[in-house]
Structure formats: structure tokens, C-alpha cells
Amino acid sequence: MASPVADASRRRREKRRQLDARRSKCRIRLGGHMEQWCLLKERLGFSLHSQLAKFLLDRYTSSGCVLCAGPEPVPQKGLQYLVLLSHTHSRECSLVPGLRGPGGGEGELVWECSAGHTFSWEPSLIPTPSEVPKQAPLTHTTERTWCSEARRKQEAEGLECEHRERTQETRLSRRVEPPLETDPSVGEDQVVEEEEEEEEEEEEEELLSDASPWTYSSSPDDSEPDVPRPPPSPVTHTPKEGEIPPVPATLPTPCAVLASLGSTAALTSDTEVQMELSRTSQVPAELQMTESLDSPGSQAQSAPNPTCDEDTAQIGLRRIRKAAKRELMPCDFPGCGRIFSNRQYLNHHKKYQHIHQKSFCCPEPACGKSFNFKKHLKEHVKLHSDARDYICEFCARSFRTSSNLVIHRRIHTGEKPLQCEICGFTCRQKASLNWHRRKHAETAAALRFPCEFCGKRFEKPDSVVAHCSKSHPALLPVQESPGSLGSSPSISAPEPLQSPEGTSFSTSYDSNPAPSTSISSPGVPAPRNTEKS
């Protein structure tokens, strides 16, 4: 009866291994470049990571640029027209435009500067001077209606294209994947499980691609992240009395470029507007405020908008959360002085330290130990048994507890995480550190004589005198006064008194005043003999 179950589990493990191997071949590890990858995907307007990978592969294998329409080289007149458009923009705006991405039309590219000015260009677009109309300012209402209609149309086309690409990708992935070798004993249940796993994998990939932390809502014609910004509106400065506004007749600026721009009159010079406002001091303040709010270019070149600062300040204030008030809650059991800042911690303390205090007892009659927690009791019970479940992977030695295994493993790894804070001694276990600290405690108890200058302690007063003469020689004359000697009875005289015969005198630290001085000399007789004589 056990053989069919074993065969089923073996087949299940084999199927899982094949599925994992197939999935591992499809995975690509980006490492620390995930953020750049997601930003590139959003910048190019792709919704799936596989679309971006296919685009990069096509661009690498193709001989020409993928963004261009066809492998044919760009005509010279088309490049000249692009240079002309860039030159026209440079006359009106000092910012350098950059390639934003493909436009709405086939083969159309869109350039945009930091001020929001855009212009489109097609390689096949070569206008003649007769076809180029003169530049005429468009009204704000026509621009807004045209932009809204064009954006709605492009969004609808982008959604249809995205849906078509997703369906095609799923079909190709299902077609390319090799079918698993189905065993007739497996049955239809495993086939259903495989289909469900494939569907879950596809849904997970879509969720990961859509719910990445760097995703933004993007439109097909706008490859930049959808940042809320005010709609560009034309800024037309009124000429002075008797002044005729200049119209560049020799520079061909097509209507397609003016229509593709979100703001037709935004190509007018923002710098010239600022210079005009600075020259004319009679302009009211309200007009200056309206023009600075309407023109996006003036916002980019001038000082930051105060309204934006107020908005950001309000957002920052909203995000600041008030710190919760911490209440001091002492334990009300007699004899316990513990204080807690959280009600949950207090209840936990009462439950396991007072109410159910050591309710878990050891089942061994000779032991009689009790514990507050059940896990501590389980670890203790292992000490009474011969079970050694924790085995060292280096030497195959077994242990009863995991803590003993961790300490033993440090012998093989050479790790010594515990360190003495006094001398820097390192060890592997806490018992060795406690034994080492006893030496410092005994030594500190033996050092009874401190130095009054630096606080260093010594075992003998002579060591204090030698230390003072060596480390603090400049402070010794101050301490040789009688008042200072009487005020510090714990320290002997800095220098021992020398007799003419070479006898040295040293002050004793005994409590009795009688033997306060002692005379020691190897070649001189005792002091009592000299007194009698």
C-alpha cells in the first residue's frame, strides 16, 4: 500500500523540479539595477517587462534605429529641417530640448525642453517655403480643445495596442513552452494543476509589472511619468505703443509643429517677457502674477512658485504624526516595582510573572523545577533525556540544546563575539567572560591606594609615590607644604627622606601613631642602639 503513495509523491516532486527548472530559464536577474530598468520601461511606455526586453533585443539586432520609420537613412533635407526647428526654439527659449519619445503619428518624434515647450519632427517631412504658412497665434480655447481631442484619441489607440500586445505575448509564450511529458498514471488532475500554475504565474508577472514601486500612469504619447502640472497656456506680451511684433518670415515653422504643441504661443520668448516686465515699471503687480502663473517657462527659470512651497509645506505638515503619549503604568502587585509604558507589556508581565508564576513544572520527581514559559520547560526536559537533536555540521557532534550548538560552532568558525570592556579580552561563551571579570574585580579590591591627581589606583603607597614622581613631577612642590601633607593622609611623602649615612625614611600607613617612621639600612645599627649611646 505504501508503494503507490511513494510513486505519487515521487512523480509530484519530479513535476515540481521540471517546473522550477523551466521557470528558472525564463528568469533574468537584474541585481541592483531594478530601479533603472523600471524607469526605462516607464520612459519608453511599455507595460510589461517582456516588452522592454524584446524592444532592446530588436534594437540590438537591427542595423538602424528602431524608433525610426524603416531602415532607410534619414534624408539630408529632413535633418536640415530638424536643425531649423531646434534653432527656432533656441531663439525663443534658452533651455536645450531633449528627445521625449515617439509621437502620435507614424515615425513622428517629439522633443521637449524643461520649460514644457515641445515640437515634433518626422524624417519624411520636408516642407517647401511655399507650403509653410506664416506663424499665427492661436487662441487658448482652440489649443485646449485640440489637445484634449488628440490626447483622448491617442489614449484610446494606446489602450488598444497594449491589449493587442498582451494577448499576442501570452499566445506566443504558451506556444513556445514545450509540453511536459505526461504520464498516463498522473491523470487529468495534474494537467489541471499545471494550467492553474501557469495562469497564476502569468497573473503574478502582470501584478509585479503593474504594482512595481516605480510605476506611474503613462500615456502612449507621453513617455515621461505623469506628474501633475498646470496646462501650458500661451504667453503673449503686448508690444509697446508704435512697436510692431516681429514675425519671422524667412524661418519656416510648419503648422503641424504648432498644432502638435500643447501650447502654441509657449514658443514665444519667456526670457523676453521677463526682460519686458523688468523694463516697464508701470506694469501692475496683478498682471505680473498672472503671467508668471500662466507661463511654465517662467516658472522653470524664475524663483520657485510660492504656491508650490505652500502646498509642499502643507503636505509635510500632514505627514508629521503626533507622538503618542506614554503613560507610566506600574505593576500593582505588592513587592514588584516594575514600570511599563504599554498596557500590553504590563498585562504580559502580570500573567507570566505573578498570576501564572512558574506554572510549568518539570515532570521528573527528583528535579522539581518550575518555569514561567512552556518553551523553557521543553528545553529543560531535554536535559533529563538522552535526545541530542542538534548536530554540528563540521564535526557531527550532537548537543541537547541549540544554544550549546551555537557556542560549539564558534570553535570551527573562530568567532569570539563576547569582549571584556576593561581590557578587550574576547571569548566564545558567557561563562568564560564572567570568569575573566572576576580577575578585574579582585584586582580592583586589592588596589586600595589611589593617586589624587589622576585617580589611578595602586596596591602599595610606595607605588603611589613612584607614580607621582614620574607622572606628576610639576605638581609635587605644591603638595610638599605642611597643610597639604596633613590633608592627605592616604598618600605618603612624594620623596623618601635620606639620612647622611644613606638611611631612607618612609611614612607608614598604620593606624597607630607610635611606629609612624621606620629606619632601614643594611650597614647601620638599629636606632635604639644609637639612642642609648
UniProtKB/Swiss-Prot annotation:
One of its GO terms (cellular component) is nucleoplasm. The lineage of its organism: Eukaryota, Metazoa, Chordata, Craniata, Vertebrata. It comes from Rattus norvegicus. SUPFAM superfamilies: beta-beta-alpha zinc fingers (SSF57667). Transmembrane segments: none annotated. A zinc finger (C2H2-type) spans 329-354, 360-384, 390-412, 418-440, 449-472. Belongs to the krueppel C2H2-type zinc-finger protein family. Residues 124-251, 290-310, 478-533 are annotated as: Disordered. One of its GO terms (molecular function) is DNA-binding transcription repressor activity, RNA polymerase II-specific. Keywords: Metal-binding, Nucleus, Phosphoprotein, Repeat, Zinc, Zinc-finger. This is Zinc finger protein 692. The keyword Mitochondrion does not apply. The modification Phosphoserine is found at residues 233, 471. Residues 481-492 have a biased composition (Low complexity). It is found in: Nucleus. Residues 149-178 have a biased composition (Basic and acidic residues). GO terms for biological process: negative regulation of transcription by RNA polymerase II; regulation of gluconeogenesis; regulation of transcription by RNA polymerase II.
